[in-house]
Amino acid sequence: MSSVSRREFSAQALGSLMTFSLLETLFECEAFGKEVQPITARWLNELNDLGRDLRDEAMSQVAWQEKVEELFGEVNLAELLKFVDLEQLAAEAKLVEKGARSLRCSFPKIEGLPTNLVFGKQIFAVKNRRSVVPHGHNNMATAFLVLDGTFAGKHYDRVEDEEDHIIIKPTIDRGFAQGECSTVSDYKDNVHWFKATAEPGFLFNIH
């Protein structure tokens, strides 16, 4: 595993705030109606506070995972996602027979919201019974959010790195539906594997 300082990790992890980036994107696209924008704005601010705590080393990686998942539980994300045009997204996505189609997304600045976040973001479009390739991460906090469809999700702790393989231990094995998320860090649930159990399946990912 490559070496990285805590400060360098925190800077990367700050850019990995999945929920902040997704909702920021939806705000840009005016995907939310006026009746839900105040709720979403509060949510964004709370998520940004979590990112600031992580950046300032006031929060551990695992605590960040727990808080992000807890915050998801406080808002009916499935209801908010009804304001997103997933039908259009499904019509435009060209699903592949193997693996997942990666759809790049971008958005301009939003007045009044934090800027200068550095992160990678994408939406995975997956056919039924196809998977995002199982993988693990080094020096990264990342997360997946189910936008549409259902998935069989598996996570593993990364116990030890050997010269030509890694030793892992199962931690999560369950179904994931719209609005549910999972998180990853160096210390918890590092390896993950998502297989679509309905079509189309869409996952929003920040890495």
Positions of predicted regions on the chain:
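N-terminal secretory signal peptides and thylakoid transit peptides that target proteins
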Residues: 1-17
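C-terminal segment of N-terminal export signals and the immediately downstream linker at the start
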Residues: 23-62
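A short glycine-rich, His/Asp/Glu-containing loop-to-beta-strand
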Residues: 98-128
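Conserved short histidine dyad/triad with adjacent acidic residue
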Residues: 122-137, 186-188
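Glycine- and acidic-residue-biased ligand/ion/polar-headgroup-sensing regions
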Residues: 141-152
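A short hydrophobic beta-strand segment most commonly corresponding to one strand
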Residues: 143-145, 198-207
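Short acidic-glycine-tyrosine-enriched beta hairpin
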Residues: 160-188
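Asparagine-centered strand-capping/turn motif at beta-strand->loop junctions
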Residues: 193-196
